[in-house]
């Protein structure tokens, strides 16, 4: 990795193994999670702690666990759970959504193509998209490969079980396989 920014992001956000200040409390609060879900919770905690976003859009969550980790990592974040086709009307602060930093979590299930397309067309360039299940099957893998090449996408990180997409297109387009 030649980019200092990408190196720091991989080292201190994606692969950080040092226990964060809230991990122990969160493990007691949110118990009974399988290993992969706990790993994702911690990743979302670190990502939100790093970005300090104004909004976190949680599309079709399989569990409420992400909410606890996200809100513990950033006190100012406005968490929104979306269980149906997304519309800006679902968010009280919709006028800020297109101009503020936002993290959108979308599992590649249900009608994910429309949700991803909507997010890419409407969120600010400071936003980040996290897609779960990018290597789940042939279709999701193909979708991920197309997304990497999409003109609305900047730097991407392939973590195998999920993909992190930065919408800042003024950065040199690069896909890091971590």
Task: State where each predicted segment sits.
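A short alpha-helical cap/connector motif
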Residues: 1-125, 135-178
């Amino acid at each position: 990795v030649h980019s200092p920014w990408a190196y720091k992001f991989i080292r201190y956000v994606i692969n950080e193994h040092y226990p964060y200040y809230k991990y122990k409390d969160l493990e007691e609060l949110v118990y009974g999670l399988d290993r992969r879900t706990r790993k994702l919770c911690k990743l979302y905690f670190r990502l939100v702690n790093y970005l300090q976003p104004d909004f976190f859009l949680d599309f079709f969550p399989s569990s409420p666990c992400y909410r606890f980790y996200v809100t513990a990592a950033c006190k100012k974040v406005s968490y929104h759970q979306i269980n149906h086709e997304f519309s800006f009307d679902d968010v009280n602060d919709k006028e800020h959504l297109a101009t503020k930093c936002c993290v959108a979590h979308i599992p590649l299930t249900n009608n994910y193509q429309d949700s991803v397309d909507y997010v890419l067309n409407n969120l600010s360039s400071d936003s980040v998209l996290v897609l779960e299940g990018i290597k789940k099957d042939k279709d999701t893998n193909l979708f991920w490969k197309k997304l990497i090449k999409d003109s609305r996408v900047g730097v991407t990180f392939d973590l195998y079980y999920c993909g992190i997409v930065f919408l800042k297109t003024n950065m040199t387009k690069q896909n890091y396989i971590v």
